[in-house]
Design a protein with these regions (language model features):
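Predominantly a Rossmann-like dinucleotide-binding segment in NAD(P)-dependent oxidoreductases
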Residues: 1-73, 193
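Residue-level signal for the nucleotide or nucleotide-sugar donor/cofactor binding architecture
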Residues: 26, 151-154, 171
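C-terminal helix-rich "cap/oligomerization" subdomain common to oxidoreductases
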Residues: 87, 159-200
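NAD(P)-dinucleotide binding in Rossmann-like oxidoreductases
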Residues: 58, 70-79, 83-154
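Solvent-exposed beta-strand sheet faces enriched in polar/charged residues
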Residues: 48-50, 95, 199
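Active-site rim elements
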Residues: 20-23, 69-71, 143-147, 165-173
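A general structural signal for well-ordered alpha-helical segments in protein cores
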Residues: 31-32, 153-157, 183
Length: 200
């Protein structure tokens, strides 16, 4: 998920003791959660990551979402990327930024999945495949199911139902643990300057 100079430069976002991190924690958590869901929640085993602050240190740095200068005491990253290896052999590359020189106004959130039988893009719902016998390339757009509620609101309803009915959480804790372990791995890898193991 990438943004171009689009963030809220207040303490709750830019001070690590209050936020826990920058865009990795703020917006990366959402794209990572969705990606792992699309992948079937494989177990992460190692992470190589970078989490740095460069662009928001420049003189005159600003956010299109908030007036004024970026606070001088900002101590979280403005860009992070990670390479994740999973127990099943899958890999993942993630990039998140609040301030990247990227051709978007607002937010660019995309997921590309690549497998042996095809590739897919979210949110475009494109599916790409190849017939190796006939040497044909196929590009299809999948039908997107419409929702009665906005997806985030639907998540809240499902969680409330689970609590009211003493049922299991619709999102098992293990899935959230994988997300947090990967984000933590990106920060640990940045600090240690190497690939780190994810112990779960």
């Amino acid at each position: 998920m990438l943004r171009r100079n689009a963030f809220i430069p207040t303490a709750g976002f830019v001070k690590k003791e209050l936020s826990g991190g920058g865009p990795c924690i703020d917006i990366g958590v959402h794209v990572l959660d969705l990606t792992l869901w699309l992948m079937g929640h494989p177990k992460p085993v190692s992470v190589t990551g970078v989490a740095r602050r460069e662009l928001t240190k420049k003189p005159g740095a600003f956010s299109v979402w908030h007036p004024g200068a970026v606070p001088a005491d900002m101590d979280v990253e403005d860009f992070a990327s990670g390479f994740v290896r999973f127990e099943n052999g899958a890999t993942l590359v993630i990039e998140v930024s609040w301030a990247l020189h990227h051709d978007t106004m607002g937010e660019d959130m995309q997921i590309w999945l690549y497998g042996q039988d095809g590739g897919a893009n979210w949110p475009k719902a494109e599916f790409l495949s190849t017939n190796y016998e006939t040497r044909q390339l196929y590009n299809r757009t999948l039908k997107v199911t419409s929702y009665q509620l906005e997806p985030h609101a639907q998540e809240c309803v499902e969680f409330a139902r689970a609590v009211a009915n003493d049922a299991p959480s619709p999102v098992p804790a293990e899935q959230s643990l994988y997300v947090i372990a990967i984000l933590d791995g990106i920060y640990r890898s940045q600090r240690e300057g190497r690939e780190v193991t994810v112990d779960l």
